[in-house]
């Protein structure tokens, strides 16, 4: 069986620069990430929209860092090829409140 190569940010950059088609999808759990990876998806985005689509909140403002880490960990445990991007919750990256 061929060894599966894990995509890196350098691979994504090269694919972009060479205009090579890439497949992206938003996924929040282990089973879906496993099947997406098996299907050859290149990039899996773990978005804060998981709070609305999975947890049933009315908007993404309810996303916490702990929740986003939990979703990202579940996805990364499932994949061997895809590059995983984890979203940050709203305002978790803001340095000040001007």
Predicted regions and their residues:
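N-terminal amphipathic alpha-helix/helix-capping segment at the start of soluble metabolic enzymes
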Residues: 1-26
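Hydrophobic faces of well-ordered beta-strands that scaffold small-molecule active sites
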Residues: 23-27, 44-46, 84-88
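Conserved, mostly hydrophobic/aromatic
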Residues: 25, 29, 36, 75
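Glycine-rich, proline-tolerant flexible connector loops at the mouths of alpha/beta enzymes
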Residues: 32-33, 39, 43-69, 88-95
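Intrinsic-disorder/low-complexity, polar/charged segments
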Residues: 8, 95-96
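Short coil/turn connectors at secondary-structure junctions
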Residues: 19-22, 39-42, 79-82
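Alpha-helix-loop-beta-strand connector modules within alpha/beta enzyme cores
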Residues: 2, 6-10, 57-90
């Amino acid at each position: 069986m061929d060894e599966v190569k894990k995509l890196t940010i350098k691979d994504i950059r090269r694919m972009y620069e060479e205009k090579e088609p890439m497949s992206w999808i938003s996924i929040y759990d282990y089973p879906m990430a496993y099947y997406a990876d098996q299907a050859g998806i290149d990039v899996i985005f773990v978005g804060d929209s998981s709070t609305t689509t999975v947890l049933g909140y009315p908007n993404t403002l309810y996303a916490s860092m702990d929740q986003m880490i939990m979703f990202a960990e579940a996805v990364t445990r499932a994949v061997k090829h895809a590059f995983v991007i984890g979203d940050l919750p709203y305002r978790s990256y803001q340095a000040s409140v001007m």
